[in-house]
Amino acid sequence: MDINMTRIYLASRSPRRAELLHQIGVAFVIIPSDIDESVYNAELAEDYVLRLARGKAQSCCARLPALDMPVLAADTTVCVDGKILGKPESDTEACAMLASMSGRWHEVHTAIAVASRDGTEVALSTTRVKMAALSRDVIAAYVSTGEPRDKAGAYGIQGLGGTLIERIEGSYSGVMGLPLFETAKLLRNCGVAIPGTQD
């Protein structure tokens, strides 16, 4: 594959993932994926995000007969007490999610997959996050902003949700939805040049 390739397909509509790719100088074309994101019975959070990231990438590949550029896909989930927290379906559910993490550590798992003519590579980023102790009023005020509605775990660390986080151990960009270290590594493996970096 041509080492001078600088464009990829991004299998995501996430503005946060787009922002992070712009940050590292990778141009992309969005081709949204459409797969079933249901959790399997007794499926671990790590296995869940790896399966979805791989499935999203391969689903997009199937719609690209030429596959002239690599496809990057990702999936993020939050896990507390072994329970997977996806995107809240209502403000009530968002409040419950935030209450379950209040004053406690939880994990954010983000898997990425890069598919090319040579196959599909995957990587996993896991970050521990400590949320501050939150009162009902603080939770209600945050949820009323609307920010939690499209976020796994009902918060966005890059926005107002960042004021609720005391500490993280791991990848900040991974919590945002695209771990840049792992992403750059897999893209370089596919011949995508990342400005200012090398193997």
Curated annotation (Swiss-Prot):
Keyword entries, A-Z: Cytoplasm, Hydrolase, Nucleotide metabolism
Which residues pair up as cystines? none
> Hydrolase: is it a keyword of this entry?
yes
Task: Extract the InterPro entries matched here.
Answer: ITPase-like_fam, Maf-like
Q: Which cofactor does it need?
A: a divalent metal cation
- Reactions that this protein is recorded to catalyse: dTTP + H2O = dTMP + diphosphate + H(+); UTP + H2O = UMP + diphosphate + H(+)
Biological process (GO), any one: nucleotide metabolic process
Q: Where is the active site?
A: 75 (proton acceptor)
Top-tier EC class:
hydrolase
Q: What is a single cellular component term in the Gene Ontology annotation? A: cytoplasm
Q: Where is this site: Important for substrate specificity?
A: 16, 76, 158
Example of a GO MF term: UTP diphosphatase activity
Q: What is the annotated localization of this protein?
A: Cytoplasm
Q: Indicate yes or no for the key word Secreted.
A: no
EC numbers listed for it are 3.6.1.9
What family classification does the UniProt entry report for this protein?
A: Belongs to the Maf family. YhdE subfamily.
Role this protein plays? Nucleoside triphosphate pyrophosphatase that hydrolyzes dTTP and UTP. May have a dual role in cell division arrest and in preventing the incorporation of modified nucleotides into cellular nucleic acids.
Name listed for the protein in its UniProt record: dTTP/UTP pyrophosphatase
Query: Which organism is this entry from?
Result: Methylobacillus flagellatus (strain ATCC 51484 / DSM 6875 / VKM B-1610 / KT)
